[in-house]
Amino acid sequence: MNVKGKVILSMLVVSTVIVVFWEYINSPEGSFLWIYHSKNPEVDDSAQKGWWFPDWFNNGIHNYQQEEEDIDKEKGREEEQRKEDDTTELQLWDWFNPKKRPEVVTVTKWKAPVVWEGTYNKAILENYYAKQKITVGLTVFAIGRYIEHYLEEFVTSANRYFMVGHKVIFYVMVDDVSKVPFIELGPLRSFKVFEVKPEKRWQDISMMRMKTIGEHILAHIQHEVDFLFCMDVDQVFQDHFGVETLGQSVAQLQAWWYKADPDDFTYERRRESAAYIPFGQGDFYYHAAVFGGTPIQVLNITQECFKGILLDKKNDIEAEWHDESHLNKYFLLNKPSKILSPEYCWDYHIGLPSDIKTVKLSWQTKEYNLVRNNV
């Protein structure tokens, strides 16, 4: 090849190199993709990574992360469902079966349950209230000789049988703190003692407790418990007094009157009294030795009863059965949401009829000649 031919060949080679280089620097894919441009469509950055890395590695990472996300979501759904289950209100027919006791009244005309042994499902109730982590309060008054005669046995038996397995606060009202006996309590129980002003007459002691309970609910009890019972001290727990008794407002059937006709009840029959209930009216006769409900409902009960007591004092009259007469008037106008059978406050002097399957709480022997002289 002559010199001219070599020059031409060299120029062609240089031109080709220049063209290739120019295409390379102006191509986003680079020289490798330019060479195979006709076989590879333009792809974005993520697709390039997928092409360069093995599929099994990329998919493995993705599935693992997705699995973790799915597990977290499932846990979240389970937690939300658990919270929803915990706050779902328990329906009456979930735990109550009135047909189990056909021989007695188990449902009122306003559809409130009357709780008798055998009518309730304890397991369902315990499971529900355990999730709620409830605290139940119990107020009791021991004035004068009631401290030495009744207080220790009442609290000791309550420690054993009242709301077992749940937090309980005993609110003990006395006129002499120095006389309160030491009582060893079980787990989940606490004891709070308050000194109250003594009254000259036992009738006034009985009636003034409505005022005192209301004051303590407002001051602290409403922030400390979910439910509250108020009981007389001259009683003894005989068996489990449990969560089947809890409700918005709870009334106790009086053992001596639960089978009587309303016209025979010892309601206050004088028109001058705020506790007046005329003949022909009334549902049941309720015992003031046991009543309860939520703190706000109990506050309303005590405040309304005390208003009636003050009105009677203003009119120089005293209801036949004092605070109990006013309590019966209250429940006539404000129907209780739950009623406890006489099994929950029984007097053994009546005997033990077939209606009474299990005595939960019983009256102590009344020694009025000893304990009512508080002057």
From Swiss-Prot:
Database matches in Pfam families: Glyco_transf_6
Which cofactor is recorded for it?
Answer: Mn(2+)
For this UniProt record, give its keywords in alphabetical order, as a comma-separated list: Glycoprotein, Glycosyltransferase, Golgi apparatus, Manganese, Membrane, Metal-binding, Signal-anchor, Transferase, Transmembrane, Transmembrane helix
- Which reaction(s) does its UniProt entry say it catalyses? a beta-D-galactosyl-(1->4)-N-acetyl-beta-D-glucosaminyl derivative + UDP-alpha-D-galactose = an alpha-D-galactosyl-(1->3)-beta-D-galactosyl-(1->4)-N-acetyl-beta-D-glucosaminyl derivative + UDP + H(+)
> Which sequence ranges are marked TM in the entry?
7-27
Query: What domain of life does the native source organism fall in?
Result: Eukaryota
Q: Where in the cell is it found?
A: Golgi apparatus, Golgi stack membrane
Q: Might you name a Gene Ontology BP term for this protein?
A: protein glycosylation
Q: What EC class is this?
A: transferase
UniProt KW Membrane keyword = yes
- Note the InterPro entries from the entry: Glyco_trans_6, Nucleotide-diphossugar_trans
Mapped to this chain, the residue ranges on the Cytoplasmic side of the membrane are 1-6
Locate the active site. 324
Q: What is known of its domains?
A: The conserved DXD motif is involved in cofactor binding. The manganese ion interacts with the beta-phosphate group of UDP and may also have a role in catalysis.
Q: What role is this protein assigned?
A: Synthesizes the galactose-alpha(1,3)-galactose group by catalyzing the transfer of a galactose residue, with an alpha-1,3 linkage, on terminal lactosaminide (Gal-beta-1,4-GlcNAc-R) disaccharide borne by a glycoprotein or a glycolipid. Preferentially glycosylates proteins, can synthesize galactose-alpha(1,3)-galactose on glycoproteins but cannot synthesize the glycolipid called isogloboside 3 (iGb3).
Q: What is this protein called?
A: N-acetyllactosaminide alpha-1,3-galactosyltransferase
The organism is Sapajus apella (Brown-capped capuchin)
